[in-house]
């Protein structure tokens, strides 16, 4: 099925899948974070069996997730009024958990929202003040930044500091362009060239989202950009022109998966849906 036409959707599982979708090819499993209530859990959907299990019952208001180049699960822990926000790293085999980073220049993070791992090992994440605005985090002490963390030097750098509410982020296939969704008013998808050394430059608005907000962002092998909104997943070319859409009301986030990375797994708070494409995730 072409990405330019509506692919057939099938419901994979009924479960409280909200954010952080990650496909682990070595397990043929789909990881996600649950709908925020008193707590948020990290769960695992075994795709072959269709069974859901709890990986971490209380995950500190976890939101976005990604696999790093070693296969560990990077988790955006938004934190609470009493627990600090951080980026953590979870060993899927043992359950061992460690802090990657929890502060910038000695100041606590706001509420990390989404994360992407670059091929050079650096970790990029957005840190909007959503937690404070939603009443489960203290007043922010820093701006709503996009950060780059270098595990080798342990240096955390604010690479973008002019966005209102940065949310989803993803790289182009060659990692020379960084895409970021801004959920402030107005709602935009932005694109930035990434120079050697890992700093975004020469960027700006690629596409406007009205009235919905861009949330999850992914890119396929051809460089097409996929962005979730409340009405489904929109597909844009590198110029920001919409060239397709997967209509699914209530869509929150998504990821490419399957052995060939040609299935889009989409969370909608009450279920996980799948759309088979003839394009592959980058």
Features from the language model and the residues they span:
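Sequence-structural signature of mature extracellular/luminal beta-sheet repeat domains
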Residues: 1-282
């Amino acid at each position: 099925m072409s990405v330019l036409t509506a692919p057939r959707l099938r419901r994979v599982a009924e479960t409280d899948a909200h954010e952080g979708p990650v496909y682990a090819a070595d397990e043929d499993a789909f990881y996600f974070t649950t709908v925020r209530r008193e707590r948020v859990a990290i769960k695992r959907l075994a795709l072959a069996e269709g069974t859901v299990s709890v990986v971490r019952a209380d995950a500190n208001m976890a939101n976005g997730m990604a696999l790093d180049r070693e296969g560990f699960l990077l988790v955006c822990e938004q934190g609470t009024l009493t627990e600090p926000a951080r980026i953590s790293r979870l060993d899927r085999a043992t359950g061992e958990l460690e802090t990657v980073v929890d502060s910038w220049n000695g100041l606590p993070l706001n509420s990390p929202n989404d994360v992407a791992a670059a091929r050079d090992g650096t970790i990029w994440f957005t840190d909007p003040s959503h937690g404070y605005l939603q009443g489960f985090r203290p007043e922010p002490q820093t701006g709503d930044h996009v950060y780059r963390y270098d595990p080798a030097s342990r240096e955390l750098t604010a690479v973008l500091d002019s966005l209102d509410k940065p949310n989803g982020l993803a790289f182009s296939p060659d990692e020379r362009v960084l895409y970021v969704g801004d959920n402030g008013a107005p709602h935009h998808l932005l694109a930035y060239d990434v120079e050697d050394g890992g700093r975004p430059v020469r960027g700006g608005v690629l596409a406007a989202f009205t009235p919905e907000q861009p949330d999850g962002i992914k890119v396929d092998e051809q460089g097409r950009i996929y962005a979730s909104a409340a009405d489904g997943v929109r597909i844009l070319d590198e110029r920001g022109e919409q060239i397709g859409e997967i209509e699914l009301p209530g869509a929150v986030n998504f990821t490419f998966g399957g052995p060939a990375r040609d299935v889009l797994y989409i969370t909608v708070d009450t279920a996980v849906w799948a759309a088979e494409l003839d394009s592959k995730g980058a």
